[in-house]
Amino acid sequence: MPMQDHKYFYLYSITNKTTEKIYVGVHKTSNLDDGYMGSGVAIKNAIKKYGIDNFYKHIIKFFESEKAMYDAEAEIVTEEFVKSKKTYNMKLGGIGGFPKHNTAGAKNGFYGKSHSRETRLKISIKSSRKRGPRGPRGKTLKMCGANNPRYGKIAPNAKSVIINGVLYKSIKIAAKALNINYSTLKGRVKAGYYKCQD
């Protein structure tokens, strides 16, 4: 039986020797000498500008689990930390550093309002057209799920993507593994937050 690679979970800091500006992040790896120097846009740009030799990395703490690692990052990389001019961090710490938006209650632009009877009727008619005997949005039911010849296969034009040092075969697979909406992740890839490989 093949031996599983041991995974290390750790919190680290990277410091610019010239400016003393820091970046705090987390990393999951089976190779402690993988040369990982952060995934943030600002830290990557700083390394390009000043050169890798102008930075040093310090492992702050190792953790037993990925959750404990992300929880520790969330405690340090707070909103105040991100806003500081002495840090390279651009996003709050925690699971992948994705910002969390709360649009419940008064923060929702439609809070306290309601659609008119006429608008509700229009919405009802429009949504009923999307469903029908042929299935959702006009697709035939016989081609859904396992009946589709491409079901479970990676699209031939799919590109691999690297997120937080992990290589995923496609954006769709990454979105599913990270529990992130596909469109959101695709937008982040297009915006340059993550690298695609051909």
UniProtKB/Swiss-Prot annotation:
Cite the InterPro entries for this sequence: GIY-YIG_endonuc, GIY-YIG_endonuc_sf, NUMOD3
Enumerate the cofactors the protein uses. Mg(2+)
GIY-YIG domain location: 7-90
Please state the Enzyme Commission number of this protein: 3.1.-.-
- Entry keywords, A to Z: Endonuclease, Hydrolase, Magnesium, Nuclease
Give the top-level enzyme category: hydrolase
Pfam families according to UniProt: NUMOD3
One of the record's GO molecular function terms: endonuclease activity
PROSITE patterns given in the database record: GIY_YIG (PS50164)
Functional note: Probably involved in the movement of the endonuclease-encoding DNA.
Q: Which family does it belong to?
A: To endonucleases of group I introns of fungi and phage.
Q: Under what name is this protein listed?
A: Putative endonuclease segC
What species was this sequence derived from?
A: Enterobacteria phage T4
